């Protein structure tokens, strides 16, 4: 099944498309780029064999879903759902923008809105959650603007650059999303973006 979000905002066209075989090398390059790796849990250069195992495992894993983010037809990042739990109606999510050229354009905010709408509207889930390195302040603050609440602080949860690093756990409930949705929708449309799933 392919789920695409393709809209024509005044400024930029953003699409989330399913990962394909043609993305194999691109995703490895992105995962190993310093800009992306700095905020991932892994702290080593990912080799081809390790990456191929991860990539090949995507297709048969019903608890995960991956998309490539495109801006104006150019692949610029990746978004995913993980720990998809249909019984408890919850899942985790993450994304990264590998291309510095799209940072500051509101792309991350658009992806956040898209994912929330997809999880609560399309999937009908009750909870969306994520984990973010405490040092990645701009991302966890973006989540909080969208209504995510801090549910945990995992101290010394991972090792980054040889030192323990703290991780923030955040969650958003479907019942809490309507209180934030209108304001966040207005911010996106003010930037010239069409709302996803509208």
Q: What is the role of each PLM region?
A:
Residues 24, 35-36, 63-64, 124:
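Generic structural signal for secondary-structure transition and capping sites
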Residues 42, 65-73, 81:
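Short, charge- and proline-biased low-complexity linear segments
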Residues 27-31, 51, 55:
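Hydrophobic alpha-helical core bundles mediating ligand binding, dimerization, or RNAP-core interactions
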Residues 35-53:
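Conserved GNAT-fold acetyl-CoA-binding loop/helix
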Residues 2-26, 30, 72-198:
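Acyl-donor (CoA/ACP) binding surface of acyl/acetyltransferases
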Residues 31, 40, 58-59:
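Hydrophobic residues in alpha-helical segments
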Residues 56-68, 77:
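A short helix-loop-beta-strand connector motif used in the catalytic cores of GNAT acetyltransferases and
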Residues 38-40, 67, 180:
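Short, hydrophobic secondary-structure boundary micro-motifs
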């Amino acid at each position: 099944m392919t789920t695409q979000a393709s809209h024509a905002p005044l400024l930029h066209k953003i699409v989330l498309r399913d990962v394909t075989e043609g993305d194999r090398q691109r995703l490895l390059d992105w995962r190993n780029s310093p800009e992306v790796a700095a905020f991932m849990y892994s702290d080593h250069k990912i080799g081809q064999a390790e990456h191929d195992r991860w990539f090949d495992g995507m297709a048969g894993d019903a608890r995960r879903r991956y998309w490539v983010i495109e801006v104006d037809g150019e692949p610029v990042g990746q978004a995913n759902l993980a720990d998809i739990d249909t019984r408890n109606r919850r899942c985790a999510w993450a994304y990264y923008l590998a291309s510095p050229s799209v940072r500051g354009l509101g792309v991350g905010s658009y992806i956040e809105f898209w994912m929330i709408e997809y999880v609560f509207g399309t999937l009908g889930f009750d909870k969306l959650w994520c984990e973010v390195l405490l040092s990645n302040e701009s991302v966890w603050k973006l989540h909080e603007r969208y209504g995510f609440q801090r549910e945990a602080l995992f101290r010394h949860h991972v090792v980054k650059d040889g030192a323990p690093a703290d991780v923030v756990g955040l969650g958003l409930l479907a019942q809490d999303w309507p209180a934030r949705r209108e304001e966040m929708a207005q911010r996106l449309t003010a930037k010239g973006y069409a709302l996803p799933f509208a």
